[in-house]
């Protein structure tokens, strides 16, 4: 049953009801069942950690995924949607370390790995319930029951298989490399992890001296921002090709050597130093210097504390002398290795432990955290006379993405996957992927791939998938395990879990006589696990082998732009290494969601609203649409603003809901008042003659076509603005322009066509918007589907809108010419509105004329066809169309496109710009025709110049106009005041106040009311306006309008005082209508004969009770009144022809159709009299004079629209009704005969009133 739609809606509350509906009918699982045998659409969901609550970044990516997978399902695919959880790695361990106060490996050793991992396992799914609640509340359909977790043994086994494939291909090796190292997490990070969290920091900036052994009065000067690396210094490096100088420091009296180009780093003035010698850097090669500290003097045997040369030393910063600590800098390591200062088998000079503290080798600073030791080191250098300058330096520095602590660079033995040798293949596979936006593939991701480095996959941690390598003590024998079965076979143990506590103790017998092989201690980088998820989530290749291979690569993935150096990268590396192909076909990359001030969202700073509170306040649909309709979907950043979500609710969802509500209201009215059942069947809907119907249907089909194209290309950022714009077009244009039609004011046939059009468009819009706003579309659909003719339904199951397939384009409905015509009309109306706003003239006040000037006669022809809408929307009396600019003083002027021309013309732009602005109207008219013009020797085209119209108000005869234009048209609006128009405007203000009170009372159009009014004092301007516009007001509000006093018997709904143009107006609405209705039985008539159509009324009795009309007389009266001649008439009610024996009184209030014989196509059945009327009450006739009756009805017009009755005619017709044509009468508005109807009261103001008829006495009466 069709439900009435409330005026006010609580979107979050309604969404909760929809969630209950989905749960009750298990809608998500049901849709998966329905699509089971359809083609597969493969989707991979990147696994988040459940150790924290979902934030806006998760919500955004989840919304994109939900939209695309819903779209894929509704496009005819089967889409498995499994949620995944990242359970291992630093995020989990860091939480445990904080909770338990664990500071390093020693603390874990004391606790034991078994207990440590049990602690980690206990918190892995800490917030899983909150995740499930939030994700579900957002409307995302995804399978939590069939999820995957990286801690499942099956998942871990597949990760082992992936690793073994790489190992067998020779892509895995062990090496020492200077890596980003997290001292808080006690583990190295990969290069891409270290790039995820840069911050601007202030570090020490020190200039240190290195006296030469050959002459200790001369010192090299090196610069560093990491003083803590100086105790590990083994060399300095200079550029062999750059110019170096020996100078005398005037103030200090010291002899120093540095790069000439870097003198400014130490000295502001040239007078501060004296250059003694110049020489290339190569001159310094091999010179020895005195070490800063004596901790590693033994390294001198290998050539340490020597000047080395390498071109990596640049002139952009420092002194051109770079201090080398090879185990704390990648370039330092390379250069020292090249000069044999260190070797692969050297004992590392790396006196810093996993927690970032100096070891006992550095005796002066042992146990100090390196960053804290900076001050102590600087103080020691100063005391030793080795410090030249100490300041601070602000620069961008990497922080640990998990612990948010500064990283250090440190050499550690690690396991690597060779990536550098597959860069070309990675780039080729990247080119096979479709990226949205494409720029990410070409720039950010492509550039990252070009510089890809070997991937450190090992972590010196505990809670993770163990790397399945069993090795001999000397690492010469290595066995890589690829499955549980293989390990069971080689170790002889039964295995149920693969975490460290379950496998670390297992040994494998050596095949080379090296005793037992033990597993290495490292676990996998958690990115290796997430990069393996396509295989591991289905336990490939141990299970689902064919299913996986048939569905690989994935059709679609989506994540944030930060994943270009994370999940996107690891997916591509592993798929390329394993199969030589990309892991996905299509990817959408979103930007970052920032706080409103542009800063990163921070729980500590509390600079963003809680997502759950936003959903509770505005609903999930509003949040989804806000995020998706923003730059963030184009991989740009979004500054999250709560008011943006509120505006989506206000500007999109609410107007859309109101259009839906308006449709339902009028369908219910149609059923209640006209007894017409509304059922929509797109196969039987007739083509509407109304141009706006054809336009909105065409516009919708164009939108569907656009939607298909852009969604297939994953361009959500183009689709959403068009959908939102369509909501605006539908609500602010179509519904607004057709309100009267939809209410039935233009006849029922036209009303039904308008309702069918609105229904069709709303249903199609709901189907298109279902992936984007799943809640509101479901809410609307559950009511709309009641009105769909079951015969027309093609989908097998129509319970939910999300079961329906997306609409397909109906080419036969597309009419580009009509779309263009309406677009022209909209431009005119919008230009007119701008003028009204500029002059502060409300739309309620009518204006005389609008002039539309356009160079294209075809455009004016289009505008002409829609003239009545311009009149209604702009409230003007007359539309004038013209191509004659000169008549109205219109000139063309030009403005250059600064961005386009400035970029192209560069220095010549200024002269060209000046000349463009000086082009004459005649020159620009020629440019309009040809599309090209030469200015200052440069050929310019349409895209280079913007043309605009200008209006000279002083030109003769146009002073009353105000103008506004766009690139195509100019409109002139006559804004001179006119009293009749001002009066009408005031009457519209009264209507506005009445309708607002109706809204306050939550009344619907079918609710009967009476409106009472009282102006401040009788005889005022406001009072006279209301009295003279009573009919106009009544026609609009569809309720009787009466002056005070309010009848004591009336039930008052609302009473309010308001100010109108300085006058006070009191309005009262009461329950029920006091309209008397026609006193006599009547039928409405539609006359369709002789090629014309007319409307009118026939009274079946008059006075009441005097029934003399049968079918034959009815046809005769029709022939007489409506001028239908020489035609054999047939009369129909609905589709049934009326016969002679039909009791006409039984048809009272119905609409009959009179034709030339054929049955009508559609009958309007209205219970409201089509023509204006008054009821008559005879007061004082003698009994013998009123044998015909004392109550009658008089039609003020018939046929419809012909109402020329005068006061004398009214007296004559009243006497005629009662058979009193020989008597003189007086007419009154009240029974007490105190308000006589005289000639100065317009007859049309009496519509629907009761007129009291008094018979004047004659001499015979005395």
UniProtKB/Swiss-Prot annotation:
Keyword presence, Calcium: no
SUPFAM superfamilies noted in UniProt: Anticodon-binding domain of a subclass of class I aminoacyl-tRNA synthetases, Nucleotidylyl transferase, ValRS/IleRS/LeuRS editing domain
GO biological process: isoleucyl-tRNA aminoacylation; osteoblast differentiation; tRNA aminoacylation for protein translation
A GO molecular-function descriptor: GTPase binding
Subcellular location: Cytoplasm; Cytoplasm, Cytosol
Cysteine disulfide links: none
Alphabetical list of Pfam families matching this protein: Anticodon_1 (PF08264), DUF5915 (PF19302), tRNA-synt_1 (PF00133), Ubiquitin_IARS1 (PF23567)
PTM-bearing positions, type Phosphoserine: 1047, 1049
Motif segment ('KMSKS' region): 600-604
UniProt xrefs under InterPro entries: aa-tRNA-synth_I_CS, aa-tRNA-synth_Ia, Anticodon_Ile_ABEc, Ile-tRNA-ligase, Ile-tRNA-ligase_type2, M/V/L/I-tRNA-synth_anticd-bd, Rossmann-like_a/b/a_fold, tRNAsynth_Ia_anticodon-bd
Top EC class, one word: ligase
Residues annotated to bind ATP: 603
Record-listed N-acetylmethionine modification sites: 1
Known EC number: 6.1.1.5
Disease: Growth retardation, impaired intellectual development, hypotonia, and hepatopathy: An autosomal recessive disorder characterized by severe growth retardation with prenatal onset, intellectual disability, muscular hypotonia, and hepatic dysfunction.
Protein name listed in UniProt: Isoleucine--tRNA ligase, cytoplasmic
Gene it is expressed from: IARS1
